[in-house]
């Protein structure tokens, strides 16, 4: 994306596997929230940039490739026991409850945080 043009589609946030942030914008943003140990910090950082009035644009060209994490190796795998899924969910690569609630509350507000914090547990209990 060319910084001085409106090239690219606007979006709400980003995954920081490949993101370019102009220096003057970087200097005006806080660092990634220390509440996050692994995931969600980059998405939260993008939302913070938008809240400060910056636009996020998706490049019209490929600038990199990142392989998705397969469901088979995550807490979402319904073939794992409930105990294993819960353990994986609470790991840094899952959705640790405090971090997940913090992310939701900060970016979507309290009601959404309460409801969506419970959904992973219901999915585990119901084997979904």
Report residues per predicted region.
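A recurrent flexible, glycine/aromatic-enriched loop bordering the glycosyltransferase active site
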Residues: 2-21, 85-89
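Active-site donor/metal-binding and catalytic loop motifs
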Residues: 52-82
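Non-catalytic, C-terminal membrane-associated alpha-helical segments of glycosyltransferases
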Residues: 71-72, 76-128
